[in-house]
Amino acid sequence: MKISRQAYADMYGPTVGDRVRLGDTELWIEVEEDHTHYGDEVKFGGGKVIRDGMGQSQRCDDAVMDTVITNALILDWWGIVKADVGIQKGRIAAIGKAGNPDTQPDVTIVIGPGTEIIAGEGKILTAGGIDPHIHFICPQQVEEALMSGVTTMLGGGTGPATGTNATTCTPGPWHIGKMLQAVDSLPMNIGFLGKGNASLPEALELQIKAGVIGLKLHEDWGTTPASIDNCLTVADQYDIQVAIHTDTLNESGFVEDTLAAFKGRCIHTFHTEGAGGGHAPDIITACSKDYVLPSSTNPTRPYTVNTVDEHLDMLMVCHHLDPNIPEDVAFADSRIRRETIAAEDILHDMGVISMISSDSQAMGRVGEVICRTWQTAHKMKVQRGLLPEDQERGADNFRAKRYIAKYTINPAITHGIAHDVGSVEVGKLADLVLWSPAFFGVKPACILKGGMIAAAPMGDPNASIPTPQPVHYRPMFGAFGKAASATRLTFVSQAALDAKIGEELGLDSPLSACKGVREVRKRHMKLNDACPHLTVDPQTYEVHADGELLTCEPATELPLAQLYHLF
C-alpha cells in the first residue's frame, strides 16, 4: 500500500527528506533519520494502532514504558530524527521504535497496559532549556520560565534584595539553606551560585559545603585579580564552576589582567559581549581563549533598532545608578556599544559564543531565552545565508543544531550537570518539550518535567473538552504536591552531597552533584567551539575575527514576536 507524502505527514508526521519550518522564521530543518517503521507506526486513538493485542502488549515487566511519545521529530545537537521516545521512572529509557513485540518487528520500546501515550505526530521534541544566568529575584520567574520551555535554572539570589537585583549570588550558608528549602517543591531543576568575591578561601568553602553548585564573581562586589585567583583556586579543589561578570570600569585591571588571573583555568564568562557588564570595550576578546566558556544574555539577542536605547534605561535601574550623577551616566554609556552587539550576532553564528541565558529581571527576560535564540538564528540566516555546513543539504540543520546547543547541552556541560540534563538522550531526566512547528520557539505545546506533564496550554476547566477558550498556560499535575519535588533535581556540589545537606535541611527533592567541571574547555562546547583571534578597536569599537570585520545591520522586524502575542 502506498500513500502520498503529504497524507503520511498529516497522519504520522514528517519523515526522511521532509522539511519543517520553525515558526515564522526563515529556518527550515530536514528529517535525517526515521526510526519508526513504515506500515508499523504506532498511534493512539479510536480505530488506531495502540489497542490491546495490537500495538499494546500484555507485558507488565521492567521493559514496559511508563510513557511513550509517539512519532516525534527530535531536534537536538546530535541530530534531527523521527522516533518514538520511551520514558521510565522519570528518565528517558529508549529512543527508537515503540509497539508490541508480540505482533510487530524490531520493537525497542514496549507499550503495555501500564503505558501512557503522548502524541508526538507532527510535533518537534526538544530537551528542556537550561538558563545558567538567573537572578532569583522572585519565585514567579519559575512559572514564567517553565511555560517558555526552560526546565533548569542556575544562578543566585535571595529575592528582591538590592544585592540580588544586581548580582547572581546567594551569599553565605544561612541564605543558601533557606533558598534550597524555598525551591524544594518548585517544578524546576535549580542550582545556586554563591558569592565568589573574596581574597581568602574559607568563606567560599563554607558556601560550597552549604549547597551551591558554583560561585559567582561580580564586579559590583569587586572582581579583582586577587578574588578571581582565589575563587578559581577553591573551585579547582571542589570541582565546581565559576561564573564571572568582569570589571567594566577597568579599575582593578584590564581584560588582559583578568585573563592572566584565570591562569588557564576554565570559567563561565557571563554576557561576554559586554552590554551586560565586563571590561569596556573589549571583554568580547575573551572568546578567543580555550579556557573561557562564553555566554550571552538575551536583551542583546539579536541586534535590533531598539537594542541600544532599551539598554541604557535597563542599566540605570539594575545597577543602582543615578541619572543625576555624570559618572554613573558615563558608566552606562561605556557598556552599550552598537559595534560589539552587532559582532555578537555573527560570533553566535560562527559558533564562537557557546551559550545564551537570560539575566532574569536584571537586564534580561526569563521567559525569552528560547525565542531570542531562534530570532538570532533567523536574523543570521537572512543576513548571512546558509552556513557552509548546510550548503549541500540546502536546509538549516547544522545551524539549528548549533543554536539549540546554546541553551541545552552546552550550559549543562559547563556546569557539570550533563549527566542528568541538557539533551534528548537515554538515561537523562525526561525534561522534554513538545512544540507544534508553527509555534516553535515561542509557545510550547507541552512541557514534561521528570516524565510528568508539568505545564501546558489548557482551555476552560469547566468545558466539555480541553480546548475551548480561554486557552492559556497553566501548571499541570506535575507541578503540584509531592510529585513536583519528586520530578525535579536540586544541583549542588559533591562536598554538599557528602555533608548530607538534604537531610540536614529536610529537603524532599533528590540532590545531584555537579562533576567533571574543571576539565571543561571550549572544545567541549557542542558545535560552538570556535576560538578565532578577536580584536576590538579602542576608538571605533569595531570587532575583527582573524582580521575580518564583524558587522551587521540591526533588525527592524523579527519572527516569533507580535504575530504570537496580544501584548
Swiss-Prot record:
Binding residues for Ni(2+) 2: 216, 245, 271
Xref: Pfam families: Amidohydro_1, Urease_alpha
GO term, biological process aspect, one: urea catabolic process
SUPFAM superfamilies assigned to the protein according to its UniProt record, in alphabetical order: Composite domain of metallo-dependent hydrolases, Metallo-dependent hydrolases
SS bonds (residue pairs): none
Keywords: Cytoplasm, Hydrolase, Metal-binding, Nickel
Places the protein is found: Cytoplasm
UniProt cofactor note: Binds 2 nickel ions per subunit.
Annotated positions binding substrate: 218
Keyword Cytoplasm: yes
Catalytic machinery residues: 319 (proton donor)
Enzyme class: hydrolase
Annotated positions of the N6-carboxylysine modification: 216
Residues that bind Ni(2+) 1: 133, 135, 216, 359
Modifications made to the protein after synthesis: Carboxylation allows a single lysine to coordinate two nickel ions.
Location, primary (coarse class): cytoplasm
Pathway assigned to this chain's UniProt record: Nitrogen metabolism; urea degradation; CO(2) and NH(3) from urea (urease route): step 1/1
Cofactor(s) the protein requires to work: Ni cation
Reactions listed under catalytic activity: urea + 2 H2O + H(+) = hydrogencarbonate + 2 NH4(+)
HAMAP family cross-referenced by the UniProt entry: Urease_alpha
Protein family: Belongs to the metallo-dependent hydrolases superfamily. Urease alpha subunit family.
Name under which the protein is recorded: Urease subunit alpha
